[in-house]
Amino acid sequence: MYKLVLVRHGQSTWNLENRFTGWTDVDLTPLGETEAREGARLIAAAGLTFDECHTSVLKRAIRTLNIIQEELDLLWLPVHRHWRLNERHYGALQGLNKKEMSEKYGEEQVFIWRRSFDTPPPALTADDPRHPAHDRRYASLTARQMPLCESLKDTVARVLPYWHETLAPAIQAGRRLLVAAHGNSLRALVMHLDGMSPDEVTGLNIPTGLPLVYELDSNLTPLRRAYLGDAEAAEAKARAVAEQAKAGTTERP
């Protein structure tokens, strides 16, 4: 039996401000740092350890991973950073407030942009300063690999090659992996592992900072998955993610 641990980055500054973040490289809040430390505490209490770590090229995920490593005295572990684990690219919505967009366009439209499987948000234009071509961390990508926006379907298509070519072979070689990534790149992995339909994944919300542990058989079929820590707390944090775009609600601190 293999184990795989997934963790979404701790609260970021734009999570706090309730903005669409996507590939924008924002940092953790003090609460986000605390969430990462608490995630490390839960991992230690469960007796889990790792052989290597994987994350995106965005600092909120990288710093979450680094905090967890430091708390576990595992800063020496190899870390693989890859753009395929980045958050879903929210196109022209990046930087905009979710609640304000709900008030302007309606909650239903914003829900479709956030949670539908195959409907992308409005795209960036090629000359937009937010385009990945203006960021040297993506200098090795082809024009086709640089998104102007992404649906969840597009995000799944981006993430799965990293699963098949990197993560799955490492797990089957007996490596114990910790993956620190983002809400939608992790939704893509969970959808694949659990065989979820597009309708099922629409209702899936990944809470910040809580380690999700998979037990996998020799074919990497899940035998069990569960968040570490209190189940009710995990459900409450997942519900908070779902509430972010509602016009009549306020984002949690």
Swiss-Prot record:
Record field: catalytic activity: (2R)-2-phosphoglycerate = (2R)-3-phosphoglycerate
Site label Transition state stabilizer, positions: H182
UniProt-listed SMART domains: PGAM
Active-site residues, record numbering mapped to chain: H9, E87
Gene Ontology biological process: gluconeogenesis; glycolytic process
One function term, GO molecular function aspect: phosphoglycerate mutase activity
One Pfam family from the record: His_Phos_1
Binding-site residues for substrate, renumbered to this chain: 8-15, 21-22, 60, 87-90, 98, 114-115, 183-184
Family to which the UniProt record says this protein belongs: Belongs to the phosphoglycerate mutase family. BPG-dependent PGAM subfamily.
Entry protein name: 2,3-bisphosphoglycerate-dependent phosphoglycerate mutase
Natural source organism: Oleidesulfovibrio alaskensis (strain ATCC BAA-1058 / DSM 17464 / G20) (Desulfovibrio alaskensis)
Lineage, top ranks: Bacteria, Pseudomonadati, Thermodesulfobacteriota, Desulfovibrionia, Desulfovibrionales
